[in-house]
Structure formats: C-alpha cells, structure tokens
A protein has these predicted regions:
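Short, acidic (Asp/Glu-rich) active-site segment that either coordinates a divalent metal cofactor
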Residues: 28
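Flexible, small-/acidic-enriched active-site or ligand-binding loops
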Residues: 1-21
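Alpha-helical interface subdomain recognition
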Residues: 22, 31-194
C-alpha cells in the first residue's frame, strides 16, 4: 500500500549532509527501523495493559444472572490466557530494549566493528522475534477484550474499541507479523538451531 510518491528532482546533497559512509545507509536505516519497531512494541504493551485492566474492571462490574460476569469460570479462563499473553509480551519487549542497548556501541577498532556487526545481527533477530510475539499478543488481547465487552466493545463510546484499532495498526506498522517471522527465520543460525 502506497500512500504517496516522493520525487526528488534536481536535489543536490552536500558531503556534510551525508549520514554514515559509503554503503552504510542500509545498516543505518535497518537500525532506525528496528528502534521504531521496538518503540511500537512498547506502545502496544501499554495499550494491551490498558485493555486488560478495562476488561477486568468490566467483568467485575457487569451483572448477568444476578452476579458479576467475572464470576463465570469460562471468562476467568479467558482473562488468565490474556494475562499470560500480556506477560510474555512484556518480557519480550524488555528483551528487545536490551538488544537495542547492546547494539548501540560506537565506532572504534576492527574488533569493536566486528562486535557491532554481531550485535546488529542479534538485534535484528531479537527485534523480529519480539515484533512477531507482541503482534500475536496484541491480536489475542485485543480480540479477547472486544469479545468480553460484548456489543459495547465495538462502539466508539467505549475506549476499548480505540485501543483495539490502535493495536491492529501497530501490528501492521514497520513490518507485520509475517514479515518479521520471515526476517527472523532468515537470520544466520536459525536453520542450524532448528
């Protein structure tokens, strides 16, 4: 899906405006996209936590058959599954932040450059694993929250619908789950470990 075409005609960029060296643009862009993906995962984590909390409160207050619907075991099981997905996503988001911190080393000796290259490969693998896992959790928690809210879950009056829409957009931004799964599997070491 293209939203726009950008055409640069007659643009001259001076040497002082170049970021990085020759043939380094891809690595810089790759790192920037990874940072963006991790920030989106952090945003998704906040949205999932909010949806979880809203849904839990709704189950405590919504009455059916003379009791809060949160007393029904089937709904308790669904909330437990949502809590598991939420905590897995939280752990993965922390892992991604750690991978970014480790790959953020500066320039230096050849050994430092080799370490940075290895860190970049690890960063790519970790970020893709995290974006995939957070996407799964966002879909599970978002859909679960909407379903547990019943018909109210899809109305604009209830904030849950807006959080669900945002989670759906986050999953598609900077590479969807399929893209990140393919990227993860393409990393060196994946086939040998499998």
């Amino acid at each position: 899906l293209r939203a726009a075409d950008v055409v640069l005609d007659g643009v001259v960029v001076g040497r002082d405006a170049v970021i990085g060296g020759v043939e380094e643009g891809g690595a810089i862009l790759d790192a920037a996209l990874d940072y963006g993906a991790v920030l989106l995962c952090a945003e998704a984590l906040g949205a999932m936590q909010t949806l979880f909390d809203m849904t839990l409160e709704y189950l405590k207050t919504r009455q059916q058959f003379g009791a809060p619907i949160g007393k029904f075991q089937a709904l308790q099981h669904r909330m437990a599954d949502m809590a598991i997905h939420l905590e897995q996503a939280r752990s993965m988001a922390l892992l991604a932040a750690l991978a970014l911190a480790r790959s953020a080393g500066g320039a230096g000796s050849d050994s430092a450059n080799a370490d940075r290259d290895a860190s970049a490969k690890t960063r790519r693998r970790v970020v893709s694993a995290v974006k995939y896992r957070v996407g799964l959790a966002a879909r599970f928690i978002g859909q679960g929250a909407i379903q547990l809210h019943g018909g109210m879950g899809v109305t604009d009056e209830l904030p849950a619908s807006h959080y669900f829409k945002r989670l759906s957009m986050i999953e598609l931004t900077l590479g969807d789950m399929d893209h990140h799964l393919e990227r993860f599997m393409a990393q060196p070491g994946f086939r040998e470990a499998a």
